[in-house]
Amino acid sequence: MNHEPSLDSPNVLRRAAYSQKAPKVSGFASYLQEIEADAFAGTFLLPNWLITYHAQKHGWSRSDLTREETVYQLALRCGASYQATVWALERNNIINAATREQLLDVKPKQIKERVGHVREAAETRNDAWVLNEGDNRADLAISVGDTITVDLSQQAGAGYLWIAKKPAPASLTELDCSVSTKSDAVGAPSTRRAFYRADDQGSGQLPFEHKRPWEQHSIDEIAFNLSILKPEHGLSRANRIRQRQNRQGINAG
């Protein structure tokens, strides 16, 4: 890919032996090298089967994967960067070149703000997770400082609501909770949203049950398994996720 020599190339090692500095890359060449490296890494981090797996779990169509919010959530679950995920989608013929350019024009910071990752709640460098029915029983590796939006559809017109089955883990702080209807029609389905921030290390479960508040039994249950650790400096996000999962003895969800 015409990259400049890496630190382990023979030429650089020979220069180091004579206390000479390795050549530096700057400007557009550096930017291009970063893009190429990102795309190359995506070949290993984002094989087609992994994209298909998460798309099927969440019911994401090919059209959904042209939306930056969906691509960002896919990237989080695959442990890859947003940019690498965009390139992988094109490489696997899920999007075309024009869509790739449109997606790359959008910065992850803008996407986070759209899903509720406001500056007052968390730093923009942290991730903004949106969890729904497709993440049921999934083992999710979260970093301290990340925000979590739980987004669940409910049949409020029939009296069924998503209710927290038990308090959230102590490492999470609940910041907000809201209900919005999908239409003005009487009895229309609604969405329950709960907004959290990961403030400390820890692991635990975030469980909900779909039930009428006055009834004992639920008609459905959902739980998200969370592993929250501080970011490991010097490691890529993908390696941090794998390391956290190995420590907790969990598999990628």
Task: For the regions a language model picked out, list residue spans one by one.
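Conserved binding/catalytic microenvironments
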Residues: 1-106, 253
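Residue-identity detector for glutamine
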Residues: 20, 33, 56, 73, ...
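Pan-zinc metallopeptidase signature
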Residues: 62-167, 236-238, 250-253
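A general structural signal for short secondary-structure boundary/capping elements
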Residues: 8, 16-22, 119-123, 196-198, ...
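Extracytoplasmic soluble-region selector
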Residues: 128-253
